Amino acid sequence: MSASLVRPLRASGLLFAVLACAAAAQASSFDCGKAASRSEKAICADPYTAGLDSQLGQAWSATLAKAKDPKALRLDQRQWLKERDQCEGDLACLRGRYRSRLIELRYINVPFNWQATWQRVSVSPFYAGELVTRRTGQEHLTFDLSAAGGANSGALQGKALIKGDEASYALDDCNLRFSRRNGLLEVTQEGDASACGAGNGVYYSGRYVPSGQALDSHYDLLATALVRTEEEDQRARKLLQKDYQTLLDSGSVFSQETSAELKGAEATDMWLQGLATTNAAIFVRGTKGELWVALLAVAGSSDEVRVRYYTTEPEWKHSLPDVVQHWYEARSKGQQLALDMMP
């Protein structure tokens, strides 16, 4: 049995390229001896995530010191802590919350203006979104929205009615609410993707920061928590070489699997929504950081879809563990995809 989990995440490369290497070495911003919730205990047990917490503590203090409305900002932070704690022990969820919040804090003190271009905060490049708002008179707001969900996309234009710190839009079964959150804009959607003019799995909800350009993306295996440490990430880069990026391009949806042969290993089936026949992979991490990876690759002038298999373990270089074999058979679907055993 597998449990699917969609992870709408993306990070800012400008911020994390500078800070990521130091994350694992930093302690959390709170006393781990007093950690009470599952999320706090998970943070304290994982040095990389604890480092993100430390960075957030510093960014929070600096942002609060410059806030024009400290009370509103504290309320917002308390709400964020509630959302963080909903992750419980899920490291991918926790890392995504922290990375997203670090981006938000960079923009949260920017003076709010309905006349702006906005980018959706997301750790994954597969869930980017852009919103352009223009105020037309005292009570109306025109908007132009676009968003991605895996390889699918959506776009919507309309006119919303402004009341105080919110604007609302309703047409048939599509309802949007635009809410001011300090210097940010929060979009809430009611109605499914098709009702709002979008492809399968595409939604406009989320927090948007004022920026005329797309947020720099620094999406890696650490962001997804497929690897735990910088050392493991470097091992994966060395093993996969150019296919490290192929692996990242293989997943907007993640599903957990189990292996009878690799006791205690974490196996993650991943695929790109809308392009699962060409963009998919399985990533297996052993209890000591061993790696087994199989991924789809489009090769040659005929765009043949092949499977490339990598592992750090010499004894597995020429055979597939059970969970990888099952993935390979499922992806082949009777057509027997060519299998390349990579060195």
Task: Map each language-model feature to its residues.
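Bacterial N-terminal signal peptides that target proteins for export
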Residues: 2-14
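Bacterial N-terminal signal peptides
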Residues: 12-22
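Amphipathic, heptad-repeat alpha-helical segments
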Residues: 31, 39, 43-72
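Contiguous, well-ordered beta-strand patches that form the walls/edges
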Residues: 82, 147-185, 283
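Tryptophan-anchored aromatic micro-motifs
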Residues: 110-131, 171, 204-235
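Short, surface-exposed coil-to-beta transition loops
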Residues: 125-131, 152-157, 171-175, 202, ...
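N-terminal glycine/threonine-rich, aromatic-flanked beta-hairpin/loop signature
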Residues: 126-162, 233-260, 265-268
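A short, surface-exposed interaction/processing loop segment used at functional sites
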Residues: 195-197, 204-205, 285-332
